[in-house]
């Protein structure tokens, strides 16, 4: 259910804004999206895992807050480019 260290470093290198950028909002969204995908796959098999379902909702809310910050700080163009790269739906338009 959690992502491996190698996968996390791949996401960081793919979404970083500059070298050694591990905490930018783009990287945070990418890592949260990967964790959400993993939990979604887990819940397809284990339908009654309500503890996991609650954790998934927490991650979705956290990603939504980070996406709101990206949209506010960087503008609609960067926000739309990020959600297109992540392959998720637009929640604001």
UniProtKB/Swiss-Prot annotation:
One of its GO terms (biological process) is translation. Pfam families: Ribosomal_S15 (PF00312). GO terms for molecular function: rRNA binding; structural constituent of ribosome. CDD domains: Ribosomal_S15p_S13e (cd00353). InterPro entries: Ribosomal_uS15, Ribosomal_uS15_bac-type, uS15_NS1_RNA-bd_sf. Keywords: Ribonucleoprotein, Ribosomal protein, RNA-binding, rRNA-binding. SMART domains: Ribosomal_S15. One of its GO terms (cellular component) is cytosolic small ribosomal subunit. Transmembrane segments: none annotated. NCBIfam families: S15_bact (TIGR00952). HAMAP family: Ribosomal_uS15_B. One of the primary rRNA binding proteins, it binds directly to 16S rRNA where it helps nucleate assembly of the platform of the 30S subunit by binding and bridging several RNA helices of the 16S rRNA. Belongs to the universal ribosomal protein uS15 family. Part of the 30S ribosomal subunit. Forms a bridge to the 50S subunit in the 70S ribosome, contacting the 23S rRNA. This is Small ribosomal subunit protein uS15. It comes from Ehrlichia chaffeensis (strain ATCC CRL-10679 / Arkansas). The gene is rpsO.
């Amino acid at each position: 259910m959690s992502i491996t260290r190698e996968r996390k470093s791949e996401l960081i290198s793919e979404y970083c804004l500059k070298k050694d950028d591990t905490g930018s909002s783009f990287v945070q969204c990418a890592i949260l999206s990967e964790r959400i995908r993993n939990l979604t796959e887990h819940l397809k098999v284990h339908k009654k895992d309500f503890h996991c379902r609650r954790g998934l909702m927490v991650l979705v809310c956290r990603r939504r807050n980070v996406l709101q910050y990206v949209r506010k700080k960087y503008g609609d163009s960067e926000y739309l480019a990020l959600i297109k790269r992540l392959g998720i739906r637009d929640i604001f338009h």
